Regions:
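H-loop/switch region of ABC-family ATPase nucleotide-binding domains
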Residues: 169-170
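The feature captures the beta-strand-to-loop junction immediately N-terminal to the Walker
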Residues: 16-18
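Conserved ABC ATPase signature
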Residues: 109-113, 117
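Conserved beta-strand-loop-alpha-helix hinge in the C-terminal portion
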Residues: 189-211
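Conserved ABC ATPase "signature" region
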Residues: 88-105
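Catalytic Walker B motif of ABC-type/P-loop ATPase nucleotide-binding domains
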Residues: 134-137
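Helix-to-loop junction immediately C-terminal to a conserved catalytic motif
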Residues: 31
Length: 213
């Protein structure tokens, strides 16, 4: 139940709140994945209704196993590209794999990779889709600190491409590493939204201190 929400384009938005607050529902609604999705999203002078948002939004699920479909990493990325020019698509896929350091796995079956490697394949597919809004649902769930840092680096690189990212997360370290705007959800409503400043920092510190008790 969100009447109005403005997000600076190109932001890395941390979507924060307690379990059951409505964060994942918000993410699915944003992407137009819910049959009950309502409202509209405006970006670059265009307005997108619920059934149109799926064309401009891409979701990387918490369990990326649910969105890996092909027999090789290369094919997985090609699936998201325009293949009308096969040579150009292959070149783009190679470039994306190189940027995410997964070129060595180009011929590997995605399901044979580690959790972190699978996630990078999912991120590669998100880049290949060329969609302007990318939503991540708990991208560091189950990852250690080293791999969390790598995910944060990947997210910052994505942001540098001009994408607007929404990160549904309970990970304060990930937030500190890469988020620059925040949406706090409670009981299905946006309680507050803001960039980094003294007030938002104090709010986040109180929330995560309470959550850890």
């Amino acid at each position: 139940d969100i009447s109005d929400l403005m997000i600076p384009q190109g932001s890395v938005v941390g979507v924060v709140g307690n379990n059951g607050a409505g964060k994942t529902t918000f993410a699915n609604n944003l992407c137009g994945l819910l049959k009950t999705a309502k409202g509209c999203m405006s970006m670059n002078g265009k307005t997108y209704m619920a059934n149109q948002r799926i064309k401009t939004c891409y979701m990387v699920m918490q369990d990326v196993n649910h969105q890996l479909f092909t027999e090789s990493v290369m094919d997985e990325i090609l699936l998201s590209l325009d293949n009308s020019d096969e040579e150009k698509a292959a070149h783009e896929a190679e470039s994306i794999m190189e940027s995410l350091h997964i070129s060595e796995f180009r011929d590997a079956h995605p399901m044979s990779l580690s959790g972190g490697q699978k996630q990078r394949v999912a991120i590669a597919s998100a880049i290949a889709s060329d969609k302007q809004v990318i939503v991540f649902d708990e991208p560091t769930s189950g990852l250690d600190y080293r791999h969390m840092k790598k995910v944060a680096e990947n997210l910052r690189e994505l942001s540098s491409l001009g994408k607007t990212l929404f990160i549904v997360t309970h990970d304060p370290e990930l937030i500190a590493e890469c988020c620059n705007y925040f949406v706090f959800i409670e009981n299905g409503k946006v309680l507050w939204s803001d960039g980094w400043n003294r007030i938002s920092r104090e709010r986040l510190q109180r929330f995560f201190a309470f959550e850890g008790d």
